[in-house]
A protein has these predicted regions:
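Structured soluble/peripheral alpha/beta segments that form catalytic or ligand/cofactor-binding pockets
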Residues: 1-282
Length: 282
């Protein structure tokens, strides 16, 4: 289906913009192959799911290029803080789409002055040229693996702008992916850098390693990280303390307002910044 453009993200701190960014998100049906050494996998649309997003503008700061916070004054208070984040790209043909939602620690959706400030946005679309249904309201009921914040499943109840009610059940296919392994967070590369830093080549830099993330949360400190240089997106991660991934591959069952049921797959990003009392997380 066509890409969905998120509402523009804008945040300020001490009269300076800290976020000024646009992003589009899009589901897809991939075809081709994946090769690793002598192994090769055929990629066909009926068995694989694709999701992509692209952003441009001023985004979240990342170490080691951002200033060390010890040299800066504390961030100014900005009111209620974001806790819960769901960011979902799905395909359950003939319907596909994208939506995201953010809530505070009491489960209230509101505008936040941060990098992911939008309360709710997105759309469900029938194919490339079919109808598009803007999402006007969303409710969720999530289940987690005992004693963790690792998602097991979540049911979303969505109301579109025309009053139609959709339900989607997402069930995780395995443990979440850790973005640290892509170099997205501080210390993701062996030199201590990240995706924004130079690694010895302006054309292509390659490195590899092996980790076991089958059980989460777990200890994973990255490479050459220092205290205060480890956290990503203000999630409260502390070096030497367990962490977990935040990106899930899920099956999805979509039920339309007319009762039709369609199955597919989804990319679900989900995590918490601090406590979230509706689910008992402190």
């Amino acid at each position: 289906s066509p890409a969905v453009l998120e509402e523009h993200h804008d945040a300020q701190n001490r009269m300076r913009k800290t976020t000024d960014q646009s992003r589009y998100c899009q589901p897809g049906a991939p075809s081709g192959f994946i090769a690793l050494g002598e192994r090769r996998w055929a990629v066909e649309p009926d068995g694989w799911h694709a999701a992509r997003d692209h952003s441009w503008g001023l985004y979240a700061e990342r170490r080691p290029l951002s200033p060390d916070s010890k040299w800066l004054p504390p961030k100014a208070p900005v009111g209620p803080q974001r806790s819960l984040r769901f960011w979902i790209i799905f395909r359950s043909e003939p319907f596909s789409g994208f939506y995201h939602l953010h809530e505070d620690s009491e489960g209230v959706r509101r505008q936040f002055d941060d990098v992911f400030g939008t309360p709710l946005g997105g759309a469900i679309t029938r194919g490339w040229s079919g109808e598009s249904f803007a999402i006007a309201d969303a409710r969720h009921s999530a289940e987690y693996h005992p004693g963790t914040k690792v998602l097991k499943n979540v049911e979303m109840t969505l109301t579109d702008a025309r009053g139609g009610v959709w339900t989607q059940l997402f069930e995780t296919a395995g443990p979440p992916w850790l973005g640290q392994t892509s170099g997205y967070y501080p210390g993701g590369w062996k030199d201590g850098g990240n995706v924004h830093t130079y690694h010895g080549s302006e054309e292509l830099a390659l490195e590899w390693d092996e980790f076991d993330f089958s059980r989460q949360p777990l200890l994973h400190d990255g490479y050459k990280t220092e205290d205060g240089h480890f956290d990503g997106f203000g999630r409260g991660e502390v070096k030497g303390q367990p962490v977990q991934g935040n990106v899930y591959l899920c099956s999805v069952r979509t039920t339309t307002p007319h009762g039709d049921v369609h199955w597919g797959a989804a990319h679900v990003e989900h995590y918490y910044n601090g406590p979230y009392r509706p689910y008992g997380f402190e």
